[in-house]
Amino acid sequence: MPERNHLLVVCSPKSLVLLVVLSPELLLLGTSLQLQDNAYEGLLVAIHPRVTEDQDLIPKITGMITEASSYLFNATKRRVYFGHVKILIPDTWKTHNYSQPKWENYEKANIIIADWYRKHRDDPYTLQYRGCGEEGQYIHFTPNFLLNDNLTAIYGSRGRVFVHEWAHLRWGVFDEYNNEKPFYMAGHNQVKVTRCSSDLTGIFVCEKNTCTQENCIIHNLFKEGCMFIHNNTQNATASIMYMQSLSSVVEFCNSSTHNQEAPNLQNQMCSLRSTWDVIMDSVDLRKSIPLDAAALPPPPTFSLLQTGDRIICLVLDVSGKMAEADRLLRLHQAAEFYLLQVVEIHTYVGIVSFSSKGLVRTLPRQIKNPRDRKQLSSTLPTTVIAGVGANICSGLRTGLQVIESLHGNAFGSVIILATSGGDGDISNCLSTMINSGSTIHTIALGPFVAENLEELSILTGGLKFFASDKSSSNGLIDAFSRISSGTGDIFRQPVQLDSAGEIIDIHQHFNRTVTIDEGLGNDTVFLVTWETHGPPDIVLQDPSGKKYFTEDFNTNPELKSSYLWIPETAKTGHWTCLLNNTHSSPQALKVSVSSRASDDVVPPVTVTAHVDKDETHFPHPVIIYADVKQGFYPILQANVIAVIEPEIGEPVRLELFDDGAGADIIKNDGIYSRYFFSFTVNGRYSLKVHVHQESHIRRLSKSIPRSHAIYVPGYIVNGNIQMNAPKKSTGDGDIQVQKWGFNRTTSGGSFSVLDVPTGPHLDLFPPCRIINLEAIRKEEEIILSWTASGEDFDQGQAASYEIRISKNLQKITDDFKNAILVNSSKMIPQPAGSRETFVFTPALLTKEQQQQLDGEMGEADKIYLAIRALDETSLQGQVSNIVQAALFIPGIAPSVPAREFLILKGVLTAVGLIMTLCLMIFVAHCTFSRKKKSRKKDNRTKLL
């Protein structure tokens, strides 16, 4: 595994700036979803445009949420329920009397209805990759899950499943089952089922042929093929995060019913806290007062929305500051690329320029063919109005007028605002823009843009970008490439493959190799831009060896750009692009490549990137996320590099990991993460991500995302086993081997940093929290293992570890520093990201510590352990997840009966009863016979 401390480097001026396209699913829950007077208002459900039209789907959705509202109300002790819900119908369905959406689109939905591709599967799940108590991204249901009533036997009623997933999404709790560890060893060598609560009953049965001829009774080792089947009738009322399908389960596990022993993700991520404790700590429930006993919540209300014409207006700054650093030229290059390549067909586009006031350059024009695209690009502004400032509100109001000229309102429209200044008057038009129903994407050019510019994006659900003045940066093109239609249909959207720039010396070359992988190749375009003079010498070679030269490109000398569209479908494989600076001085040369899907069934690989917050204050870090997937399947073993660029100074390159450590919550889920804290100046920072994977790598995970409803294999009904259909195998057929590999580039938007000190400062960055501590009992030893944290968060190498134990869970949870310290002084921490192992034995404790441990209140047969890392300045990381281990193993039979054991016990009991009855009859018969013979003897005596 790579050592993380070697992966943080500062780019030189000649370093390549590699960027990646942010996909829709990683937008956080919007401000539209709010809790008002105990009711969740503004929940958005969106149907993917590729879902086949079926009018039965809508009542299934409304029925599910109506049932969920009542179940949620009771599960939260009369605190919350669902109020108004919006259902967004795709434009691929027939038009009915639906309402027109405002800001709502598929990308912003809390609940998405979409098919998987390849193997048909219907597991409901929540995309959740942040910490305990933090919101997830979205809930995913398939159409078949909603339409096929047979699946309720497997997952439970849809309303109950919805509440299970809602707890993931809204409150950041985790599952209480564990498919990888369905059983665990408790004290006294007892085998227990990973469940919550532990009061749920059932039996062990054989799942596979390997144990059909023998009893599935488990002692020291688990037998392969054993599984646990629950009784369908239970007395236990918890827990919804374990098996909501059981009719008796109506609440979350609380502090009295929670199973802290179970090796599940809830215990690992939330430090053994119950789901109800985490939920009660949420903002929602802290401010919610239970309704009176006599009060009942009203049923949810629903509105149906359908997107109509897509309308976009470019609002472009031409004030005096746009003359600096070639800002207007670079903006023109990026806007033209957007119009010619990115914006989807049938979209209406208008263009406005502004300085002290707005100017209409073109009213909305629908794109029907390439001629419309060229006509629109010809109206882009080319000159700056010198000596005049930028009145952003004037430009925005003019943009609204252009949009409203088409249909009378701005509902569902998009404004792309690009500016290098601003006079601070944004507050004067903020409410107007919010109420307009238009989504505003903002692009800040250079270091002197109004500080509150991003409020326009945040409050209207738009994206925000920052483009530096570095001549080798492609930030503007990357920002425009990221802005999609919001429909979620990746088949209709361009995919950015590469974007890079470098300052090239005289007669030197700039080389790029771009891979066009399977599934792409339609509408492929290579864009070359330069800084000064004429175009460089261009040589582009396709995988078959065919070459394209400068004269094959469509060149605009004034715009300093050259395009080449590849006819039909571009060849799959490696394309090489060589740019030769033939001019008399160094200049910045840049290249961008994008393509569209060539396959209408298999989706292309996509990448999404963002940070966990819009703004941070030094020394608090941000977390960078990149979601790499094909359809909904995670891509593994990719090389993911984030490029973070400040307003002033050199960019920083940082490798992201999917290893389940540090900032990364779950291993192998396709979410690559890392802490970033190398702040050099105050202001805006841009995020760009580059993803690359070599050819012939097994890269597509066959697993579904975590945080999904459990697939119930069957139940015990009236003493009989009733099995559900076995879960469909995903097998290796879902794991794709790419002949050529792939590469992607995307923009992750921007974030702001405040309170960065000038000059040298003290080390304020502690090691990150260890989140994957594990304990395994092996004879008299307890083997601890975890992923190493770093000197600073998840980077570098920690100085030491502090391991403590206690028999009392409360003590190690609330008073870690006073728990018993284990001697780990001989252990030298490894670089961040490495696998650590430590063997604990009683010999490591002093006599006094052993006496202290023996005297602690708690169970005699188990101890709790936790760890934290320290750096060279003794800064302490947070305490890890808490694990437990058995102290001794007397060997007692399992606490849960096995199916065959129960059958054998019943047979033996019956045989015993029969034998006892036979013995009683025999004894009675013998006694009666003896008495009868005695009477006959007496009679004979008397006769004599």
Question: Model-predicted segments: where are they?
Answer:
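Conserved aromatic anchor
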Residues: 780-796
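The catalytic-center signature of Zn2+-dependent metalloproteases
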Residues: 155-251
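Zn2+-dependent metallopeptidase catalytic core
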Residues: 27-135, 331-337
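Recognizes extended acidic, P/S/T-rich segments that occur
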Residues: 798-860
